Amino acid sequence: MAKDIEATERRKARVRRSLRARAYGKPRLSVFRSSKQIYCQIIDDGEGKTLVAASSLEKANREGLKTGATVEAAKIIGKLIAERAVQAGIKDVIFDRGAYMYHGRVKALADGAREGGLNF
């Protein structure tokens, strides 16, 4: 169990190190995925502040979704974060998938964000 956690932390650190190298001051779209929900936020690492956030736990999103653990829910959250980011004046971001594979819900969130108007 401890080895799995260490491997996850190494993967996450490797991805973040790569992102820092090519960020050029752009905000970071960070994704967190649990077994039942999906969360994302756009973070300004220079200031250490969250600029925009969205999750499948929000009341408006829960009404239309049976669960937050589906690909459809992730795509809706991606479109929502993009809509909020565009309203806040953010168009270009760096996608931070964390230690997760770019597949399934993480990929659906990224596709939804692109459809909503974010560039990465």
Curated annotation (Swiss-Prot):
<dbReference type="GO" id="GO:0022625">
    <property type="term" value="C:cytosolic large ribosomal subunit"/>
</dbReference>
<keyword id="KW-0687">Ribonucleoprotein</keyword>
<dbReference type="InterPro" id="IPR004389">
    <property type="entry name" value="Ribosomal_uL18_bac-type"/>
</dbReference>
<dbReference type="GO" id="GO:0008097">
    <property type="term" value="F:5S rRNA binding"/>
</dbReference>
<comment type="subunit">
    <text>Part of the 50S ribosomal subunit; part of the 5S rRNA/L5/L18/L25 subcomplex. Contacts the 5S and 23S rRNAs.</text>
</comment>
<dbReference type="GO" id="GO:0003735">
    <property type="term" value="F:structural constituent of ribosome"/>
</dbReference>
<dbReference type="GO" id="GO:0006412">
    <property type="term" value="P:translation"/>
</dbReference>
<comment type="similarity">
    <text>Belongs to the universal ribosomal protein uL18 family.</text>
</comment>
<comment type="function">
    <text>This is one of the proteins that bind and probably mediate the attachment of the 5S RNA into the large ribosomal subunit, where it forms part of the central protuberance.</text>
</comment>
<keyword id="KW-0689">Ribosomal protein</keyword>
<protein>
    <recommendedName>
        <fullName>Large ribosomal subunit protein uL18</fullName>
    </recommendedName>
</protein>
<dbReference type="InterPro" id="IPR005484">
    <property type="entry name" value="Ribosomal_uL18_bac/euk"/>
</dbReference>
<keyword id="KW-0694">RNA-binding</keyword>
<keyword id="KW-0699">rRNA-binding</keyword>
<dbReference type="Pfam" id="PF00861">
    <property type="entry name" value="Ribosomal_L18p"/>
</dbReference>
